Structure formats: structure tokens, C-alpha cells
Amino acid sequence: QILDNETHSSEKSGMDKESMLMWSYGKLETLNLFIPRLMGGSSNEEGSDKMMAKIQEMVQTNVSSQEEMNRVQKGFGSLTYWGDQPGTSGPAYQGAVVCFLAFLGFFFAHKKYRYWILGASILTILLAWGSNFLIVSDFFIDFVPFYNKFRAPSSILVVVELLFPLIAILGLYRFFNSNETTETKAENVLTEDYKKKVLLWSSVGILGVTFILMLFGKSILGFYTSNEKTYLPPYLLDFLVDERFKVFRIDALKAIIYVGITSAV
């Protein structure tokens, strides 16, 4: 009878906060909307055969006691994911081109669209951060009906994946069709000078930041978890960071190419 009451109470009140916020998206991890493997891929993936063989060789060469081996084993989590979540099936990748066009859309689309889409996108990202931005999460858990029934805050990023293509389409439409006939006021027409400036500075800014991350991302993003830093010896941690940084740079380079081609077109 007691068990039944407890079960009923739990169902009525929803999930406890700790369980609900367990799958909270990391703040920097949000950038994998643009660069997919910024924090790795699926936590269920295994490293490449070459990577696994190298790790095994390093452990066999350097680990000399069972105590050291236990510490190393405790330090290893997922080789292919190093974000804030306990595990993931993969990043919430939106696409470099879509993100770039969405960014432009916030400058080109009509104000009646851009402000509410921008506001909804920001709110969605703050909610996806969960325990990493408790001010918003606590309010929604305490005051928004049924919100505490959802398990993973990160899943709300699906809203952004709908809003970004929407603002991108609205922005592109106005970019190509804004003239005296389509606009209600002459001052609302997007001038060629305005379009060129926005396109130029947006491209330079986004490509510049991505290029900086390609060069200095190892010190900015870390590429390791707190658990790995605590338990893994420096030679293993450095090897993991180097391998992960190589993976990141491949995706960052692809993003630069895609954005560059899109901007040029």
C-alpha cells in the first residue's frame, strides 16, 4: 500500500529535478549545431582501431601496478564523446549552411518574424542547458504545467531545428525579393549596400571564429571531461586530446568550406 502511494505521488508530481536535468546540454556543446563533433559523436561509438591499439600499447608500457590500472579504468568513459551529458546518441547537428543562413535571416527577414523567432530560439537553447542555466529551468519546472514530465532538456533543441530553417527561408526570400513592389514602405527595401555589408561581415565573423577554433581550440574547448582529467595520467590524456582535436578540425574545416561556398554563391 505504501509503495502504491509513493508511485502515485511520483506520477502526479512528475520527475524529480535531478533526474530530469541529468541530460542537460553543455553551453559550449551548443556550438555542435554548427560543427557536429565539437564534443564528439555518439557515446556508444568506439574509437578507431588505430586509436584503440595505441591506447592499449601505452597502457601496457606505462602501467605497472593494479592500482594504476584501476585508476586508468576509472578515468575512461566514452572515447568518442566528452560533453556534459551522461551519454548521447549523437550531436544535435543542424548543419553549417543552415546555421549560416539562419544567422543572415535574423538581419534580412521582416521584423515581425525575426524577433519572435530569435526570442524563441534563445529560450529553447537556455532550456536545453538545463542544470547549466538553472534560473530558467527552475522557473519552468516549478510553474509551467507538465514541463517536469519531460526527461531530457536537450531534446527541446528540436524546436531550434525547426526555427533556424524557418528564419533562413524567410531571410532568403526577402533577400531576393525585397523591392518597392513587395515592401509596404520604401524605407523597408533592402538595399544592395546593406545586403553586401551583412553578407561580408557575417561571413568574415563566422569564418574567423571557426578558424580561430581550428588553431587554438585545444586550449579553448579542452577536449576532455573532468573525470578524465582527474584519473588519467598525462600521457593518456594528451593522446586523447590530440586525437579528438583532429576529429574536430576535420568538421571545422568542412564548416568553413560550406559557409565559404554558400557566401560566394
PLM regions and their residue ranges:
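Contiguous transmembrane helix-bundle modules in multi-pass membrane proteins
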Residues: 109-265
